[in-house]
């Protein structure tokens, strides 16, 4: 527990988010792909809840996520899985309902296990430098870090139960 999120910009259109988790990558992969687990940690910033979490985990399968603010506003996103290599890699394209990223973004999640810990690298490729900079400006990293802190708790429960 207590690992920090490292955010880098490998290119003018990418954001890479790296984090270590004290759990085997099978469990981390499950927390990204099983709706009941994903809903426990990817809840969004304070004041938001994860209202819809539908996953068709197969190549060309879709996912649909909707976060709901306590004031009733919704923020939705639809994505399509392009590559799934359990438990090490997921590639998808995603598009928010209110398209603030100027088109689809490509997300590549790579999970590497070492000594019982998982190194997670999630790289998002945006359509333009401006879209990437917009994601940085709205504080995406802060929200991701809060979610990953919640994921630590979910993983600790899963490890204890196994």
Predicted regions located by residue number:
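Short, highly charged C-terminal tails/helix-capping segments
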Residues: 155-162
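A short, structured loop/turn motif at beta-sheet edges
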Residues: 25, 57-58, 82-89, 110-119
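Short beta-edge strand/loop motif at the mouth of beta-sheet-based domains
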Residues: 16, 36-74, 162
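Hydrophobic ligand-binding cavity/cleft-lining segments
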Residues: 1-47
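Intrinsic-disorder/low-complexity, polar/charged segments enriched in Ser/Thr/Lys/Arg/Asp/Glu/Gln
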Residues: 12-18, 50, 62, 76, ...
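Hydrophobic/aromatic beta-strand elements that line small-molecule binding cavities or substrate pockets
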Residues: 19, 52-55, 77-83, 94, ...
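Hydrophobic pocket/interface hotspot
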Residues: 28, 38, 63-65, 81, ...
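Beta-strand/loop substructures that line and gate deep hydrophobic ligand-binding cavities in soluble
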Residues: 91-145
């Amino acid at each position: 527990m207590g690992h920090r999120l490292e955010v880098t910009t490998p290119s003018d259109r990418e954001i890479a988010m790296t984090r270590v988790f004290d759990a085997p990558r099978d469990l981390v992969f499950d927390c990204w792909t099983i709706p009941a687990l994903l809903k426990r940690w990817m809840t969004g910033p304070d004041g938001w809840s994860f209202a819809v979490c539908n996953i068709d985990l197969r190549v060309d399968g879709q996912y649909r996520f909707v976060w709901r603010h306590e004031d009733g506003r919704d923020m939705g996103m639809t994505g399509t899985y392009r590559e799934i290599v359990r438990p090490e890699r997921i590639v998808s394209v995603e598009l928010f309902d209110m398209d603030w990223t100027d088109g689809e973004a490509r997300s590549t999640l790579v999970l590497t296990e070492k000594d019982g810990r998982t190194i997670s690298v999630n790289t998002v490729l945006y359509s333009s430098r401006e879209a990437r900079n917009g994601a940085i400006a709205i504080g995406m990293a802060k929200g991701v870090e809060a979610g990953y802190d919640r994921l630590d708790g979910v993983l600790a429960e899963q490890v204890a139960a196994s």
